[in-house]
Design a protein with these regions (language model features):
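Residue(s) in the substrate-gating loop at a strand-loop-helix junction
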Residues: 139
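Substrate-binding pocket helix/loop in short-chain dehydrogenase/reductase
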Residues: 95-96, 103-108, 190, 197, ...
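Conserved glycine-rich Rossmann-like NAD(P)H-binding loop of the short-chain dehydrogenase/reductase
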Residues: 25-42
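Active-site helix of classical SDR
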Residues: 119, 155, 163
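Conserved glycine-rich cofactor-binding loop
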Residues: 11-12
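Alpha-helical segment proximal to the catalytic Tyr-Lys
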Residues: 124, 168-172
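C-terminal substrate-recognition "lid" of short-chain dehydrogenase/reductases
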Residues: 131, 209-236, 241
């Protein structure tokens, strides 16, 4: 494929599946991680056993200087960035009146500021090259809101706002910007849900099942290769919320 792809938050969950599958399809993948070094190294070793290359890079992309380092590393080594996938994120269940300043700031920094920093730094290279693809991973909660997850919902809604606004601004530079807003996906982030809660959610989903990380990855592939889709919030949720 010969496209250079940065995936943030790529050591676990949806990000790991995205990075792994794109690497298998011969995209040049820079898999970013922050705290989960063990999982990132395991991903690299797993793929190397199949003679598949993947690059890993440690950076806390909620900090401007470390986001810059990741972007500069990629450009210096590979010459360009074709695709940026902003996936890094955290979640927290907490009643609104119990959310502390630290909780709020940590959520906004990790989920929203990281998108701002990574996208702003990457866009400079994409504008110069007159092409690019930016895919943000938001959430259905950013669209409909979630009880006891106000700060999470706000951070994800902000990502969708960036997506729509930036798509208009970057369109003339042939840079496409889209969001994928997953519903409930079977990843570590949702491990806090009980079996009863999962079953209750399934009853609300027309397809009566929880999504898989691979469902998101397939959409990522399509958005990378597409040439005319921009400014869209694509919710992969099994029909939840219809």
């Amino acid at each position: 494929m010969n496209k250079i792809v940065i995936v943030t938050g790529a050591s676990r969950g949806i990000g790991r599946e995205i990075a792994k599958e794109l690497a298998k399809k011969e995209y040049t993948v820079i898999a970013n991680y922050n705290k989960s070094e063990k999982q990132a190294l395991e991903l690299k070793e797993e793929l190397e056993k199949e003679n598949i290359k993947i690059d890993i890079f440690k950076a806390d992309v909620s900090k401007r200087n470390e986001a810059q380092e990741l972007v500069e590393y990629t450009i210096n080594k590979y010459g360009k960035i074709d695709v940026l996938i902003n996936n890094a994120g955290i979640s927290q269940i907490k009643e609104f009146t119990q959310i502390t300043d630290e909780d709020w700031n940590n959520m906004i920094n990790t989920n929203l500021n990281s998108v701002f920093y990574m996208t702003q730094e990457t866009c400079k290279n994409m504008i110069h090259n007159k092409k690019g693809c930016i895919i943000n991973i938001s959430s259905i909660w950013g669209v409909v809101g979630a009880s006891c997850e106000v700060h999470y919902s706000v951070s994800k809604a902000g990502i969708d706002a960036i997506t729509k606004s930036l798509a208009k601004e970057m369109g003339p530079s042939n840079i496409r910007v889209n969001s994928i807003a997953p519903g409930i996906i079977n990843t570590e982030m949702n491990k806090n849900l009980s079996e009863e809660e999962i079953n209750n959610i399934k009853e609300e989903i027309p397809l009566e099942k929880i999504g898989k990380a691979k469902d998101i990855e397939k959409c990522i592939e399509w958005l990378i290769e597409d040439e005319y889709t921009t400014g869209q919030i694509i919710s992969i949720n099994g029909g939840w919320g219809i």
